[in-house]
Amino acid sequence: MTIINELDGAKVIKQTKNDATQKLSVMFFEEKKGVTIEVAITGLAIAKYEDEEETGLYLFMCDKDWAVQDDHKVETVEEAIAWAEKNFDITEEDWL
C-alpha cells in the first residue's frame, strides 16, 4: 500500500487505501470531439495547502494513480470524513 505525503502541492493529512478494484465513484469527462472518458475514483485524501492564507482543508478524489480528479473544500478533518462517508461507501475505519 502506498502512503501519499503530497497531492497537487498540498500536504496529505489522512488518506484511504487506493484499491483499483474498489470503485468509490465514477467521473465522466467529455472531450472536445464528443468522446466521453470514464475515470474511476478509487482513493480519497484529506490535504492542506501550507502556503494558503485561508483556513480549510480539501478532500481530494483520486484515480488509481493518485491523480486528483476533483476536490471538496471543508473546514475540518471531521467534516471531510463525514462528507466522504455520506457520499462514498467508506467508514471511518477506512482512513489511514
Predicted region positions:
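Short aromatic-glycine-(Arg/Gly/Cys) micro-motifs in beta-strand/loop hairpins
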Residues: I37-Q69
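Generic detector of leucine side chains in alpha-helical contexts
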Residues: L7, L24, L44, L57-L59, ...
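Short, compact, well-ordered microdomains
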Residues: G56-L96
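Compositionally biased, intrinsically disordered low-complexity regions enriched in proline and serine
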Residues: F29-E30, E50, L59, D89
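N-terminal cationic amphipathic segment used for targeting or macromolecule association
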Residues: D8, N18, I37-E38, G43-A45, ...
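Negatively charged, low-complexity tracts enriched in Asp/Glu with abundant Ser/Thr
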Residues: M1-I37
